[in-house]
Amino acid sequence: YLLMLFSEILGQDYIKNHLTASALSGRIPHAQLFVGPEGSGTLAMAVAYAQFILCQNVGVENAGGNESCNLKFQSFSHPDLHFIYPTVTTEDVKTKPKSLDFIADWRSFLSGNPYGSLFDWYQILGVQNKQGEIRVEDAQEILKLLALKSYEGGYKITILWMAEKMNVAASNKLLKLLEEPSDKTVFILIAENE
Protein backbone atom coordinates (compact mmCIF):
# COMPACT_ATOMS: atom_id res chain seq x y z
CA TYR A 1 0.00 0.00 0.00
CA LEU A 2 1.03 3.56 -0.67
CA LEU A 3 1.20 5.74 2.40
CA MET A 4 0.02 9.31 2.08
CA LEU A 5 2.47 11.26 4.15
CA PHE A 6 3.12 14.97 3.95
CA SER A 7 6.74 14.15 3.13
CA GLU A 8 5.66 12.23 0.01
CA ILE A 9 3.57 15.07 -1.40
CA LEU A 10 5.72 17.08 -3.78
CA GLY A 11 6.21 20.74 -2.93
CA GLN A 12 3.43 22.73 -1.28
CA ASP A 13 5.56 23.17 1.84
CA TYR A 14 3.71 26.31 2.93
CA ILE A 15 0.37 24.42 2.94
CA LYS A 16 1.86 21.41 4.75
CA ASN A 17 3.40 23.66 7.41
CA HIS A 18 0.15 25.59 7.85
CA LEU A 19 -1.92 22.39 8.22
CA THR A 20 0.45 20.75 10.69
CA ALA A 21 0.79 23.97 12.73
CA SER A 22 -2.99 24.38 12.99
CA ALA A 23 -3.40 20.74 14.05
CA LEU A 24 -0.59 20.88 16.62
CA SER A 25 -2.00 24.07 18.15
CA GLY A 26 -5.48 22.53 18.35
CA ARG A 27 -6.96 25.12 15.98
CA ILE A 28 -8.55 22.83 13.43
CA PRO A 29 -11.33 24.50 11.43
CA HIS A 30 -14.43 22.30 11.21
CA ALA A 31 -14.75 22.88 7.45
CA GLN A 32 -11.98 23.41 4.93
CA LEU A 33 -11.93 23.64 1.15
CA PHE A 34 -8.92 22.29 -0.75
CA VAL A 35 -8.97 23.59 -4.34
CA GLY A 36 -6.54 22.56 -7.04
CA PRO A 37 -6.45 21.36 -10.63
CA GLU A 38 -6.40 17.68 -11.53
CA GLY A 39 -3.14 16.06 -10.42
CA SER A 40 -2.27 18.77 -7.87
CA GLY A 41 -2.45 16.40 -4.91
CA THR A 42 -5.46 17.83 -3.07
CA LEU A 43 -6.79 14.35 -2.23
CA ALA A 44 -3.38 13.11 -1.06
CA MET A 45 -2.99 16.29 1.03
CA ALA A 46 -6.43 15.82 2.60
CA VAL A 47 -5.71 12.19 3.54
CA ALA A 48 -2.27 13.11 4.95
CA TYR A 49 -3.90 15.89 7.00
CA ALA A 50 -6.62 13.53 8.27
CA GLN A 51 -3.96 11.01 9.27
CA PHE A 52 -1.96 13.71 11.03
CA ILE A 53 -5.02 14.73 13.08
CA LEU A 54 -6.51 11.31 13.83
CA CYS A 55 -3.22 9.60 14.68
CA GLN A 56 -1.86 12.59 16.65
CA ASN A 57 1.32 12.56 14.62
CA VAL A 58 4.11 15.10 14.61
CA GLY A 59 6.23 16.47 11.75
CA VAL A 60 6.02 15.89 8.01
CA GLU A 61 6.81 12.19 8.33
CA ASN A 62 3.36 11.74 9.87
CA ALA A 63 4.83 9.52 12.55
CA GLY A 64 5.32 9.48 16.27
CA GLY A 65 1.65 9.19 17.03
CA ASN A 66 -0.59 6.18 17.43
CA GLU A 67 0.98 3.34 15.42
CA SER A 68 -2.16 1.20 15.12
CA CYS A 69 -3.94 4.31 13.83
CA ASN A 70 -1.19 4.87 11.24
CA LEU A 71 -1.54 1.24 10.14
CA LYS A 72 -5.27 1.72 9.50
CA PHE A 73 -4.40 4.54 7.12
CA GLN A 74 -2.34 2.18 4.98
CA SER A 75 -5.61 0.59 3.86
CA PHE A 76 -7.69 3.78 4.22
CA SER A 77 -9.87 1.95 6.73
CA HIS A 78 -9.67 4.12 9.83
CA PRO A 79 -13.16 4.00 11.40
CA ASP A 80 -13.24 7.77 12.04
CA LEU A 81 -12.33 8.65 8.44
CA HIS A 82 -15.21 8.84 5.98
CA PHE A 83 -15.14 9.50 2.24
CA ILE A 84 -17.79 10.88 -0.08
CA TYR A 85 -17.20 10.84 -3.85
CA PRO A 86 -19.23 10.79 -7.07
CA THR A 87 -20.99 7.52 -7.88
CA VAL A 88 -23.24 6.13 -10.60
CA THR A 89 -25.70 3.31 -11.00
CA THR A 90 -24.03 0.07 -12.10
CA GLU A 91 -24.97 -3.56 -12.68
CA ASP A 92 -24.50 -4.19 -8.95
CA VAL A 93 -25.99 -0.94 -7.65
CA LYS A 94 -29.06 -0.27 -9.75
CA THR A 95 -30.70 2.50 -7.69
CA LYS A 96 -29.66 5.25 -5.29
CA PRO A 97 -25.91 4.64 -5.37
CA LYS A 98 -23.87 6.05 -2.50
CA SER A 99 -20.17 6.14 -1.67
CA LEU A 100 -20.30 3.24 0.82
CA ASP A 101 -21.54 0.96 -1.99
CA PHE A 102 -18.17 1.43 -3.71
CA ILE A 103 -15.79 1.62 -0.71
CA ALA A 104 -13.64 -1.36 -1.79
CA ASP A 105 -13.18 0.16 -5.27
CA TRP A 106 -12.43 3.54 -3.68
CA ARG A 107 -9.71 2.12 -1.42
CA SER A 108 -8.18 0.36 -4.40
CA PHE A 109 -8.30 3.60 -6.42
CA LEU A 110 -6.63 5.55 -3.59
CA SER A 111 -3.95 2.89 -3.11
CA GLY A 112 -3.14 2.73 -6.80
CA ASN A 113 -3.09 6.42 -7.55
CA PRO A 114 -3.58 9.07 -4.86
CA TYR A 115 -3.29 11.70 -7.61
CA GLY A 116 -6.00 10.00 -9.69
CA SER A 117 -8.50 12.02 -11.68
CA LEU A 118 -12.27 11.88 -11.90
CA PHE A 119 -11.83 10.17 -15.27
CA ASP A 120 -9.64 7.49 -13.63
CA TRP A 121 -12.32 6.96 -10.96
CA TYR A 122 -15.04 6.67 -13.59
CA GLN A 123 -12.95 4.04 -15.39
CA ILE A 124 -12.88 1.94 -12.22
CA LEU A 125 -16.65 2.30 -11.85
CA GLY A 126 -17.12 1.30 -15.48
CA VAL A 127 -19.00 4.46 -16.33
CA GLN A 128 -20.01 4.63 -19.95
CA ASN A 129 -21.89 7.83 -20.71
CA LYS A 130 -23.21 8.53 -17.23
CA GLN A 131 -22.28 11.50 -15.12
CA GLY A 132 -21.27 10.65 -11.58
CA GLU A 133 -22.77 12.70 -8.80
CA ILE A 134 -22.88 12.98 -5.04
CA ARG A 135 -26.45 12.36 -3.95
CA VAL A 136 -28.59 13.02 -0.88
CA GLU A 137 -28.09 9.37 0.18
CA ASP A 138 -24.43 10.21 0.86
CA ALA A 139 -25.42 13.20 2.98
CA GLN A 140 -27.85 11.03 4.96
CA GLU A 141 -25.16 8.37 5.48
CA ILE A 142 -22.72 10.98 6.80
CA LEU A 143 -25.40 12.37 9.13
CA LYS A 144 -25.83 8.87 10.58
CA LEU A 145 -22.09 8.25 10.93
CA LEU A 146 -21.43 11.62 12.55
CA ALA A 147 -24.23 11.06 15.06
CA LEU A 148 -22.15 8.18 16.48
CA LYS A 149 -19.24 8.69 18.87
CA SER A 150 -15.78 8.52 17.33
CA TYR A 151 -14.20 5.07 17.61
CA GLU A 152 -10.87 6.35 18.88
CA GLY A 153 -12.29 9.12 21.05
CA GLY A 154 -10.98 11.97 18.94
CA TYR A 155 -12.04 13.65 15.75
CA LYS A 156 -14.32 12.34 13.01
CA ILE A 157 -13.20 13.43 9.56
CA THR A 158 -15.16 13.41 6.31
CA ILE A 159 -13.32 13.97 3.04
CA LEU A 160 -15.67 14.99 0.25
CA TRP A 161 -13.88 14.56 -3.09
CA MET A 162 -15.13 16.44 -6.16
CA ALA A 163 -17.51 18.66 -4.19
CA GLU A 164 -18.70 20.27 -7.43
CA LYS A 165 -20.43 16.97 -8.27
CA MET A 166 -22.94 17.35 -5.41
CA ASN A 167 -26.54 17.60 -6.54
CA VAL A 168 -28.82 20.24 -5.00
CA ALA A 169 -30.45 17.89 -2.47
CA ALA A 170 -27.05 16.68 -1.21
CA SER A 171 -25.57 20.17 -0.98
CA ASN A 172 -28.61 21.47 0.96
CA LYS A 173 -28.39 18.63 3.49
CA LEU A 174 -24.59 18.96 3.85
CA LEU A 175 -24.81 22.73 4.17
CA LYS A 176 -26.89 22.28 7.31
CA LEU A 177 -24.21 19.94 8.69
CA LEU A 178 -21.45 22.43 7.86
CA GLU A 179 -23.35 25.28 9.52
CA GLU A 180 -24.01 23.32 12.72
CA PRO A 181 -21.20 20.80 13.10
CA SER A 182 -21.04 18.44 16.01
CA ASP A 183 -18.01 18.64 18.27
CA LYS A 184 -14.67 17.37 16.91
CA THR A 185 -16.05 16.96 13.40
CA VAL A 186 -13.93 18.03 10.43
CA PHE A 187 -15.08 18.31 6.82
CA ILE A 188 -12.53 18.58 4.05
CA LEU A 189 -14.15 19.46 0.74
CA ILE A 190 -12.00 18.96 -2.33
CA ALA A 191 -12.77 20.71 -5.61
CA GLU A 192 -11.02 21.45 -8.88
CA ASN A 193 -12.82 24.80 -9.23
CA GLU A 194 -13.92 27.31 -6.59
Give the role of each language-model region:
Residues 1-3:
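Short, Lys/Arg-enriched N-terminal segments with co-localized hydrophobic residues
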Residues 5-164:
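Clamp-loader machinery-focused feature within the broader ASCE/P-loop NTPase space
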Residues 78, 171, 194:
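ATP/adenylate-binding site constellation spanning eukaryotic-like Ser/Thr protein kinases
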Residues 147, 172-186:
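Conserved catalytic/switch belt of AAA+ P-loop NTPases
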Residues 160, 166, 180-194:
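Sensor-1/coupling segment of RecA-like P-loop NTPase cores
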Residues 166-172:
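Conserved ATPase-coupling elements of RecA-like P-loop NTPase cores
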